[in-house]
Amino acid sequence: MVEMNFKVDAFEGPLDLLLHLIGQLEVDIYDIPMAEITDQYMEFVHTMQEMELDVASEYLVMAATLLAIKSKMLLPKQELEIDYDTLEEEEDPRDALVEKLMEYKRFKEAAKELKEKEAERSFYFSKPPMDLAEYDDGTKVAELDVSLNDMLSAFNKMLRRKKLNKPLHTRITTQEISIDDRMNSVLGKLNQQKNHRLRFDELFEEQTKEQLVVTFLALLELMKRKLVEVEQSESFADLYVQGKGEELS
């Protein structure tokens, strides 16, 4: 018999103890030698009792389970006439125990892996958030009635239409356009309207691709400064640019 050489409080429960005993014997968990394992387990329980330690009820329940399995395996098998047409494999008394041991082993290995990851994470230090108050110019970003994704979607549709309508042979000319100039142009167009309101795509008529991009950026800047807002009456409806502020009065 393998010498008992472990601490009484080193196990988290009876399944943990059984896994230790099986490991000590270096046997296959699916082929547990019940006589030897049961004897060692009972010796452990007796050691706890001799040391006048409280033996948890779960250890006693497992002891009874092991003794029952050991007894079943010692019983002689009945010799019966075998009907090979209905022959079924006889159930192993250890099956339920092995299933519990394997499940516990999986949980134990998962817990070990999580503990290792926790230890590994302790070597990393999170950087505290930076105070960006000194960079705040006090300008409040306008709350959009439509999302930026809605605007980008509408803008991309215009780019696709521009590409489809583009002639096969074009003459390329370079023309620098500032965002400030385009902002004034957008405000001018809105100011020409009685209600200072234009459909989104009307701001982008007869423009090159480069001009479209500058106009879009100018529109975003105007929204940031709360000089215009983009509205949509319902989902999938046209977008409208509404002017606001002293510049349009």
Curated annotation (Swiss-Prot):
Gene Ontology terms describing biological process: cell division; chromosome segregation; DNA replication
Record's keyword terms, sorted: Cell cycle, Cell division, Chromosome partition, Cytoplasm
Domain of life: Bacteria
Annotated localization: Cytoplasm
GO cellular component, one term: cytoplasm
One Pfam family, short name: SMC_ScpA
Subunit record text: Component of a cohesin-like complex composed of ScpA, ScpB and the Smc homodimer, in which ScpA and ScpB bind to the head domain of Smc. The presence of the three proteins is required for the association of the complex with DNA.
Function statement: Participates in chromosomal partition during cell division. May act via the formation of a condensin-like complex containing Smc and ScpB that pull DNA away from mid-cell into both cell halves.
Family according to the record: Belongs to the ScpA family.
Entry-linked PANTHER family: SEGREGATION AND CONDENSATION PROTEIN A (PTHR33969:SF2)
Protein name: Segregation and condensation protein A
Gene this chain is encoded by: scpA
